[in-house]
């Protein structure tokens, strides 16, 4: 059999392969154990001897992955080889409607021409030099982030978890800088139930799921988890004077698409101001146009001292950013933090292309309108099912809460050509499509979900 490097992957569905697929009647399920002991099913077609090399590319990729990749992911049995707009294709030409967007990353979908032009042009000029030197795209991107938000300054990194690690360090440095005479300064943190802030040790300590934290203990001490939305408990603990910063997601993504209330965030702001604690908003998933506003915090009338962003910022390339006020920035000195790859000309050029599109009022308005249409259609088509408890969200970050595990519906939809995710305790369907999704694609997504509701029985 040809090696993977010798196989040409198609960029569009093939009628010949489609005909072959229809002729194959009996699926064979192979299984492999993923992380956390989860079993990931691998679907291969009967009649392997009759399947061409091209038609067996996915199977070969899955088999070879198991030999060379550390088993941290329980992957869906799908190999994706190309994409355009909100559509993805496997090597055999099967089409998928992408309502996962790389876990809320591909804001402009796949192959956006302006994004592609920015990346290819910059790659031909200068890709990386490190932060030993100044580069123009980094400064231009920082100016855009500052102009669009509460922030005065920006620190660049490479991911959401890195951004939260930096926010942890900045918070503790702020307390030591502003209380130079104190022998014991505030070093504690508050995080909330259902929170997700990352998987590196500091960010992991702020993440509420015990199954993520337990295998790696001891992790960073000093974190107290409170009920998301509990104003009294948060206010009392902040008043203790031991809290360096409060980390909160205005809308929880991984946690189940739960939105904070305006009263809750305003109370955190007031308590932090009174105690000298910092308020950190994690908008890694809900920020940058996802809610129909440039930043999710705008809906609450509350501004943080620090905000972490990442996922969609560079349209699929790795980036993170920490946005801070001047009072925080002035406490950070040379050498307090850094990153070799952060803010590279290549990635920043990609991010500029994303921001220049997403920040337009007409674009944000379209996200808000499409999100409302999506939710209304979900309520109409799915709301009558006994397993569907609630449809919630803002803009194009949407959750469908069920009274049973969501994985069976997610799997059935995937087999029918729709990619969606789970969230919460596994009972929430998470829908985070590219922000450029069309109404016709929304209708198609809801129709596929509706047709597969029987998988929940």
UniProtKB/Swiss-Prot annotation:
Record has Plastid as a keyword: yes
Pathway(s) it belongs to: Amino-acid biosynthesis; L-arginine biosynthesis; N(2)-acetyl-L-ornithine from L-glutamate: step 4/4
Domain of life: Eukaryota
Cofactor(s) the protein needs: pyridoxal 5'-phosphate
Modified residues (N6-(pyridoxal phosphate)lysine): 311
Intracellular or extracellular location(s): Plastid, Chloroplast; Mitochondrion
Keyword Repeat: no
Modified-residue entries (N-acetylvaline), positions: 42
Main location: plastid
Record Pfam families: Aminotran_3
Biological process, per Gene Ontology: defense response to bacterium; L-arginine biosynthetic process; primary root development; root development
Catalytic activity: N(2)-acetyl-L-ornithine + 2-oxoglutarate = N-acetyl-L-glutamate 5-semialdehyde + L-glutamate
EC numbers on record: 2.6.1.11
Alphabetic keyword roster: Acetylation, Amino-acid biosynthesis, Aminotransferase, Arginine biosynthesis, Chloroplast, Mitochondrion, Plant defense, Plastid, Pyridoxal phosphate, Transferase, Transit peptide
CC terms in the record's Gene Ontology section: chloroplast; chloroplast stroma; mitochondrion
UniProt record similarity statement: Belongs to the class-III pyridoxal-phosphate-dependent aminotransferase family.
Role according to the record: Involved in the biosynthesis of citrulline. Essential gene that modulates defense response to pathogenic bacteria, conferring susceptibility and repressing salicylic acid (SA) accumulation.
Complex formation: Interacts with the P.syringae pv. maculicola effector HopW1-1 (via C-terminus).
NCBIfam families: argD, PRK01278.1
Protein known as: Acetylornithine aminotransferase, chloroplastic/mitochondrial
Organism annotation: Arabidopsis thaliana (Mouse-ear cress)
């Amino acid at each position: 059999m040809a090696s993977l490097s010798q196989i040409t992957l198609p960029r569009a569905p093939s009628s010949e392969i489609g005909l072959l697929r229809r002729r194959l009647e009996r699926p064979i399920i192979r299984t492999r154990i993923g992380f956390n002991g989860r079993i990931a099913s691998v679907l291969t077609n009967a009649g392997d001897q009759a399947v061409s090399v091209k038609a067996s590319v996915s199977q070969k990729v899955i088999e070879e992955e198991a030999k060379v990749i550390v088993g941290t992911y329980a992957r869906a049995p799908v190999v994706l080889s190309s994409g355009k707009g909100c559509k993805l294709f496997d090597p055999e030409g099967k089409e998928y409607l992408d309502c996962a967007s790389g876990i809320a990353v591909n804001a402009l979908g796949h192959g956006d021409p302006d994004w592609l032009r920015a990346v290819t042009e910059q790659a031909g000029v200068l890709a990386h030099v490190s932060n030993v030197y100044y580069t123009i795209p980094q400064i231009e991107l920082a100016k855009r982030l500052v102009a669009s938000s509460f922030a005065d300054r920006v620190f660049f990194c490479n991911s959401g978890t890195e951004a939260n690690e930096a926010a942890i360090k900045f918070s503790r440095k702020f307390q030591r800088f502003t209380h130079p005479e104190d022998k014991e300064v505030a070093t504690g943190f508050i995080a909330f139930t259902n929170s997700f802030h990352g998987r590196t040790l500091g960010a992991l300590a702020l993440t509420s799921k015990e199954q993520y934290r337990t295998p790696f203990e001891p992790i960073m001490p000093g974190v107290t988890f409170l009920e998301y939305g509990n104003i009294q408990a948060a206010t009392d603990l902040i008043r203790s004077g031991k809290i360096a910063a409060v980390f909160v997601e205005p809308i929880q993504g991984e946690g189940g698409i739960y939105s904070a209330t305006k009263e809750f965030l305003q109370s955190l702001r007031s308590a932090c101001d009174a105690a000298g604690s910092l308020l950190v908003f994690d908008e890694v998933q809900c920020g940058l146009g996802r809610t129909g506003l440039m930043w999710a915090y705008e809906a609450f009338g509350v501004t943080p001292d620090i905000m972490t962003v990442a996922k969609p910022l560079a349209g699929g390339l790795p980036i993170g950013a920490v946005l801070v006020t001047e009072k925080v920035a002035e406490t950070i000195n040379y050498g307090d933090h850094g990153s070799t790859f952060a803010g590279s000309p290549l990635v920043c050029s990609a991010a500029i292309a994303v921001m220049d599109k997403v920040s337009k009022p007409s674009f944000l308005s379209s996200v808000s309108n499409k999100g409302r249409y999506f939710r209304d259609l979900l309520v109409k088509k799915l709301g009558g099912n006994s397993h569907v408890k609630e449809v919630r969200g803002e803009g194009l970050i949407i959750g469908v809460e069920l009274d049973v595990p969501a994985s069976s519906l997610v799997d059935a939809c995937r087999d029918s050509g729709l990619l969606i995710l789970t969230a919460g305790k596994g009972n929430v369907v998470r829908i985070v499509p590219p922000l450029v999704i069309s109404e016709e694609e929304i209708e198609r997504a809801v129709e596929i979900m509706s047709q597969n509701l029987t998988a929940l029985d």
